[in-house]
Amino acid sequence: MNRERSLSGYVRSMANVLSQQLGQKVETLGLTPAQGMFLHRIWYCETELGTTTCAKDLEQFFHIRHSTVSGILQRMEAAGFLTFAVSEADHRRKHLTLTQKAHDAHAQTVKIIQESDALLTARMTEAEAAEFRRLLQLAAESVGVDARATFPQSAKEE
């Protein structure tokens, strides 16, 4: 009996391979994959939204515990990717600010993600690649993922 592979199997396999490749490349910048995601979120809030970010924002956005966020941020600070500043409005909050090192790493991370996108669509025409993106967004929304979440985007979306 010839069974076709499940769609979720394809998605899982692609996600695993892409995640491993991304992790290896991001590590050359001195970041873990989680730190890379945090870096992008903080960058996005600073650059695109014009807002500051604190640990609580990251906890809520990524749906993870304070202790996890705190550990990641402390390691990022120790590595020179960000600084903390006490909020003038609420002294319990510490705003996160990216350093120049972080901005440089972010630019490299965007390039790495663009390379991954190009690899995913290498055998597709431009129209097929656009349709693939549209279908991925629909599928993501169907399972409760915000398809327009603030993660690095391809060159066409920037």
Model-derived segments and their meaning:
Residues 1, 49, 127-158:
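C-terminal regulatory/oligomerization modules of transcriptional regulators
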Residues 1-29, 79, 158:
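N-terminal leader segment of winged-helix/HTH proteins
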Residues 6, 10, 17, 21, ...:
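Pre-recognition alpha-helix immediately N-terminal to the DNA-recognition helix
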Residues 15, 40-47, 110, 137:
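Short, locally clustered residues in the helix-turn-helix/winged-helix DNA-binding domain
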Residues 20-68, 151:
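N-terminal helix-turn-helix DNA-binding core of bacterial DNA-binding proteins
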Residues 55, 73-74:
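Short, hydrophobic-biased segments on the C-terminal half of alpha helices
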Residues 74-134:
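Charged, amphipathic alpha-helical coiled-coil/dimerization segments
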